[in-house]
Amino acid sequence: MKRVWLVIVTALLLSGCAASSSSNSEYSSDDIAFAEQMIPHHEQAIEMSEIALLNTTNPDVLQLAQEIKDAQSPEIELMKSWAGVKASTHAGHLMDGMLSESEISELRQAKGKEFDLLFLQGMIKHHEGAIEMAQKVTTSTNKDVADLSATIIKAQELEITKMNELLSKP
């Protein structure tokens, strides 16, 4: 009986190993490229949001920054869990909507209304870039990728509307 059990467990383990090594095929090269680019893109949005939490007293901007951070952190973890996705070794400043190091530095130095203006304008640009990236995989055959891209597009379009409203306030 122990031998039968051992054979069953071994077979299950081996089939599990085979499934995990072939799970790479669940994600196309476009899906992987999307995740590997969106991870540093989201990381920069979180960095910008963390700067906002320190550099503004505007309750609307504070709330927006926290919402961005809360939404994008789990999305990063989800994309990192996809088979075949490798950690990025660059800051991604050449991707759509990414702020340059000098723009991030300027954001760090700004306070008050000047900060709010730079943050909102920069985050709108950042979100527009993320939407462009996400639109490239909306038709992915992988449901996780298609669902995440749709979520990113919808959430960031709503946040752009909110940021434009904040910019129009006196």
Role assignments for model-derived ranges:
Residues 1-7:
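Bacterial N-terminal signal peptides that target proteins for export
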Residues 5, 18-170:
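All-alpha RGS (Regulator of G-protein Signaling) helical domain and cognate RGS-like helical scaffolds
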Residues 13-16:
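C-terminal motif of bacterial Sec signal peptides marking the signal peptidase cleavage site
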